[in-house]
Amino acid sequence: MSAQMPGVQLARTVTSAAALGFVPVAIKFGLFDLLVEIEKPAHRKEVLMAYEKSVGSDRKSMPCLQLIDDALYAMAGLGFVDMTVDCVYSANDITRHLVHTPSAQHGALHFTTEALLAGAFLMRRLESGGYRYPFEELHTPLQFAYHEMGNDELAQQHTYDIMAAEGRIDSFNRFMVGKFMKTATAPERLARFEYHLDPVLQDAKSRRVIAMVDIGGGRGEMMLEFKQAFPDLSDKDLVVQEFNHEIREIPGLTLSTWNYKENDSEQPIQGAGVYHLAHILHNLPDLDAARLLQKLSQAMHPQSRLLIHEFTKNANNAKMHASMIALFGGRERSASEWRQLAALAGLRVTFEAYPEGGEGLVEMRKL
């Protein structure tokens, strides 16, 4: 029995790929929500009837019974729903989590749409380029996939632009709001790492500069957490720099625009107390990450801090690492890799925390 386990584990892992392709199908037809609403084990026909009832007279793209069954069966194989030997399906803890945390469904959709497509073309992308590696952000397996599918227009665009053109960016933004689960707030996480933010904020106040800037901060979720934790901070003290033109206002915060990818674009906010980069650098190849850090270094005061919020590079996050490579040419980074990037930008690592799970923290200051 034990001698078979490595083979069993291997088979379970590598045969997941096609099953993951059914995740968008399950989400499209609301199968997770339907199983939770039914509240009891259900045959495939009961699930289809519940779906038909939910859409009412709108019968466009109605799935057949076999598609419902195969999608549910694939979800059972992934552990997302439970099933009996009689092919009766029911919600489990993961099903309920997907329903009660809507952003998790959007995340599942992202990784089984864009990331799954990119992963399928990774080896062919390497072969086509004579195994040149690492990838540049406009020449990843995802762009190669669109090239091979005959869409040369999208094959020349950045992954985010591809998602926008495919009508997928709103879903991705919804994922980024809540991600796969609700974790500790940013202030709670920093406190757990015994990182003391108060002296930095006091210094910014004494220098009469902006307290914190969140670069690529989306809709300001992290800055709002800091505002709640530090009620003395005003709207003007907390700036979100975003280049998503769909975001035009963030109540309680100051919104500004900075496209750090433009070659001649300097960081417009000089000498702030803290500059935040949360899940930005893992989207970037090393050279692009170094350029961004250099721009921030040039804007920083000797007392300024750069706080980098990224996942720890360990076995727990290896799949995320692979996803960043395939989608963006980016990567998660180790302590030594952070120090190398810091040195290239005239910075030094002055604090670091690498938890086994969840987001870590790296602080950099000017040399």
Describe the predicted segments one by one:
Residues 305-345, 349-353:
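C-terminal alpha-helical "lid/dimerization" subdomain adjacent to the S-adenosyl-L-methionine
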Residues 101-308, 312-316, 349:
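Conserved adenosyl
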Residues 25, 283-286, 332:
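Short, solvent-exposed loop/helix junctions and linker helices
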Residues 312, 353-361, 366:
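A short, acidic, flexible beta-alpha connecting loop/helix-capping segment that sits on the rim
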Residues 44-48, 281, 335:
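An amphipathic alpha-helix signature
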Residues 1-153, 203, 346, 356-357, ...:
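N-terminal accessory segments
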